[in-house]
Amino acid sequence: FECDVWAIEEGSVIFPHEPIVTVRGPLYQVQMIETMLLLILNHQSLVATKTSRMVRVAKGRAISEFGSRRAHGADAANLGARAAYIGGAAASANTYTDRHLGIPATGTMAHSWVQSFDGELESFRAYAEVYPSACLLLVDTYDVLRSGIPNAIKVFNELNEKGYRPLGIRIDSGDIAYLTKETRKMLDAAGFEDAKIVVSNSMDEFKIRDLLNQGAKIDSFGVGERLITAKSDPVFGGVYKLVAMEEDGKIIPKIKVSEDVVKITTPGFKQIYRIYNKDTGFMEADLVCLHD
């Protein structure tokens, strides 16, 4: 492989119409890597961008990636979890990425755990026995406010007597805004002001923003299918285009023209300079110019 490759540092903010990766070398070699390069960049940039949007609207509340079961295959699940972490997710329910990539693993009990016992309280006690220092209970299998939270509080009191503080509860269905407000009141009244409320169920940046605008009492979000598939906009339109040829040591710009304006390429071997405010340290603009 005789090509030179320049790339924006992974995890950096990048804007439309800017080169993310530039490859310079023999034309046949440059062309051979097109499909794989676009496959990697488009998929993972898509998921990282979607995650970043959710992280921003969550306003400091953790976003955890829960999407493997709805991903478009094993590679999409694993690489999507990686991209989500780069995009700002705090953790992933994908244990492969924990073991092989060092991404923190997270997760809670399943509804099937609760259903496999004769009663909800029994299932909570069994879970607390296994995870006394990391007890986070799923409370919506039957009835959140009449059953789930009262039973969780009973188990939390039992843990407290043994010297453990519970992590909290998770709600995966129902009127999330209303249920979290009532849950917060019940937990606080029982002396568990530090217990966290985690929610899931088809979350994305739009639903997260709506819940927070309603005053929902949420500490973190588990986000699945709408993150791992970027459901609202599932295609990242990155392209790989010839922009220059070198002839006798001279760079000759090349352009693709079209009646469709968005299909017209920007010619030339380019370089990006990012401009920061010297007083605030904030990014202010990008300058795209010719490499020389």
Language model features: what each stretch is:
Residues 2, 6-193, 204-207, 213-214, ...:
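Buried, small/hydrophobic-residue-enriched core segments of structured protein domains
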Residues 111, 200, 224:
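Residue-level "edge-of-site" marker
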Residues 188-190, 195, 203-292:
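Gly/Ser/Thr/Ala-enriched C-terminal appendages of enzymes
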